[in-house]
Each structure stands twice: as C-alpha cells, then as structure tokens.
From Swiss-Prot:
The organism of origin for this protein: Mus musculus
Tissue: Selectively expressed in cornea of adult where it is detected in keratocytes but not in scleral cells. In embryo, first detected in periocular mesenchymal cells migrating toward developing cornea on 13.5 dpc; expression gradually restricted to corneal stromal cells on 14.5 to 18.5 dpc. Detected in scleral cells of 15.5 dpc but not in 18.5 dpc embryos.
Pfam families: LRR_6, LRR_8, LRRNT
Family stated for the protein in its record: Belongs to the small leucine-rich proteoglycan (SLRP) family. SLRP class II subfamily.
Domain LRRNT: 34-72
Carbohydrate attachment residues: 94, 168, 223, 299
Listed name of the protein: Keratocan
PANTHER family tied to this protein: AGAP008170-PA, KERATOCAN
Matches recorded under InterPro entries: Leu-rich_rpt, Leu-rich_rpt_typical-subtyp, LRR_dom_sf, LRRNT, SLRP
UniProt-listed SUPFAM superfamilies: L domain-like (SSF52058)
Keywords of this entry: Disulfide bond, Extracellular matrix, Glycoprotein, Leucine-rich repeat, Proteoglycan, Repeat, Secreted, Signal
Keyword NAD attached: no
Post-translational modification: Binds keratan sulfate chains.
Amino acid sequence: MATPNCLILWVLLIADTVWTQSVRQAYEIQDPEDWDVHDDFYCPRECFCPPSFPTALYCENRGLTEIPPIPSRIWYLYLENNLIESIPEKPFENATQLRWINLNKNKITNYGIEKGALSQLKKLLFLFLEDNELEEVPSPLPRSLEQLQLARNKVSRIPQGTFSNLENLTLLDLQHNKLLDNAFQRDTFKGLKNLMQLNMAKNALRNMPPRLPANTMQLFLDNNSIEGIPENYFNVIPKVAFLRLNHNKLSDAGLPSRGFDVSSILDLQLSYNQLTNFPRINANLQHLHLDHNKIKNVNMSVICPTTLRAEQDAFIHGPQLSYLRLDGNEIKPPIPIDLVACFKLLQAFII
C-alpha cells in the first residue's frame, strides 16, 4: 500500500505532467498570430517559451531591434545580445510579475528609456544593462530592485536622487565606465541603506568616492588613478571586509599612518601601486596583496600589527594573516625571521 508521501509525490507529478502537456498543446494548436498577450500561453513569435519553464522568456541572440510584448506570467526575461536601442513602457504594461531582466549587449541609450518603463515593474529584483550605450545611471528605477548591473557602458553621470528610493539594492556594478570624481556629490549614495557590494573598478577616479553606504562590505576600485585615502575614510563604512585597490597610484604620502588599520577588513589588495613601505595593518586581516609595488624593506615594527602574546594563545589572539604576496617589489633577502614569528597562521607567502 502506498504511503501518504508517495501519494503526494504521485499527485504532484501528475499535475506537472498535465500542465506541461497543456502548454505544449496550446503552442501546437494555436497560430501565433491569434495569440493575445493576455492569454495564459502567449509567446512572442520572436522568442522561445520552454514548456518546462513557463515563467521564462528567451529572446536572446535574435537580432531584435525592439522589445516584444511581455506576457503577464513571465518572471525571467532574457533579451541579451540583440540590437535593441530603447525600453518603452508598452511592452511591459502586463509584465507585473517580472523579477529578472537581462538586456546586456544591446544598444540602449538613456534617451531610449521611457521614464516609467522600469519603475512600473514593482517586483523587479535583478536588472542587467551591461555593454550598452548608457551615459548616466538610468532613473527612476523600481524600489524593489536588489541588483543593478551597469558594467561596460559610458556612464559619467549619476543624477541627483538616482538612488534615493533604492533601499533594497544590495549590489551596484559600475565597473568599466567613465566616472570622474565630479560624478559624485556628498549625497549621491543616500538611500542605499542595504548596499553590500559596490564595484567601480576601471573608471577614471583620482580620489576615493565620498560618503559610501554604511553597510558596504565589498568595495572594488581597481584600475583607477587613486592617489590617496583620506584620514578616517573607513569610519563611515565600518563593515567593509573586502577592499580592492589594485592598479592605482597609491603612494606612502597619500596614506594616513593607520589608513588600513581597520578591524573589519579581511582581504586587502594593493597590488600594482607605488608604495615603498609596508602599510600598517590590523590583526584581523587575513589576505594581503602587496605585490608589484616599490617596497624595499620589511620593517617588523610596522608590519606586525600587535605585540605578540604568550605562545599558548598567539594563534587565537595574534595576527590572523594567512596569505601574503610581496613579489614584484625591491625586497632583498634575507626575509626577517620575525615575519614568520609574527604571522603564525601564514599558509601562503609569495615573494
């Protein structure tokens, strides 16, 4: 005799089979020209609607120049790698369930985005607009948005108030754009109360961006022209754990004496800069990249972030550094034995 769990599984399998068959029959019997966007099984003829995944609409790699009408059942919309130049309101007027839109690799401009086209999507969580022709961060955007991907555009402007209502945004990717220091005001990031990852690598910044969101945990600023870090800069982002500043123009003169002595930072990347001395670090730091600078000496009085405790608790309370890169500098052997004595948890040391 079948158990209750087996019966439930059997019923679910039957229901799924019936749904899939009904979808397939709808596609086979109906002429696409007769379909209406309000129909349960409507599928734009330019796209593919998999019967086994009825909430997804695949329209990628089809040479489309316009966005087709989006059925109301769709949660996931794939429109990448087309020739689309605009985002009007009308195709989305019934798409009230959309959670995910991928419009990467198109030709979308700010002028082509109708004002209410995106903000009307009240349930949208993920918006991908990478590799387009945007010159500023689009606005207005839906309050529900959690991730905004704008890499590899031409963004040089962030209009005032763009992020003021995006309190649910956790990830903002602006890498490989044309941002200068004048793109930021003191309140540019106001409203991003839950932002955790901010990527502005490969821009043209010379200074650290001001007033970052307090919950920022991952900050990526590689491949800019940043020359220094203001005193107490990290006080406003007390949760920052991953900091990447590779390929900048940081020098000793541009760093406060305790610029990186920040207890929250676990991974610090300063490769390919112009540092001549080992920066002061915090005992909590786990990964440190200092390769390809101009460091000549290893001064243990600066490097070792705390006075070593008794041998029995050094592993618990001492420096937590486990990975250190110093290759590509001007350091001459021998390396001080105190280096190993200080960093007892060191597992990888590249020099």
